[in-house]
Amino acid sequence: MQHGLLKPSFVQRIDFIDEQIAELEAEVEKQNAPMEEAVSLLAEIPGFDRTTAWSVIAEIGVDMSQFPSADDLASWAGVCPGNNESAGKRLSGKTRKGSRWLRQKLCQSAWCASRCKNSYFTAYFQRIAAHRGKKRAIVAVSHSLLVVCYYMLQRKCHFQDLGVNYFDQLNHEKLTRYFVKRLTRLGHKVTLQPCPAAA
């Protein structure tokens, strides 16, 4: 039998599989109709789409009262580093065992979120990756994404991005004090006057 004769058969199989996928997705939509609000909310998160939202909800549900806090949810899911510390030093950064499927979906979303322009998650990823490497940064972003899911589902609120400049704004006063102190030690008298553009 010639290979050319096999091609139509493969095309038919692919078409059949595509039809089955479409039917399954339609069925998932139907089953998730009562949770449509929650799915739509989570789909607003950078790195998420509706399929990811379905996957997360399938694992954690929509009732966050089952978890005392966002950290409890993250611990249950296995997306927060172990807290083994001695004299203030972390002994282990390994994540705890949790839902492998959920952790996988969150890590995929974390990679996507870390590449979104003007997003808090991009800044957060870069901040952690610079000191602890990309793998730990992805776990940190995954944890942050799940915490966001927790509060959005708990409060039924829309996503609000803190922005790519969040950490700069957070540390603005701290950095100002630091540089004033350094300049003073170097023998300079420092008088601060905000620039009109920064005021």
Q: Language-model features: where?
A:
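A detector of single, family-specific signature residues
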Residues: M1-A199
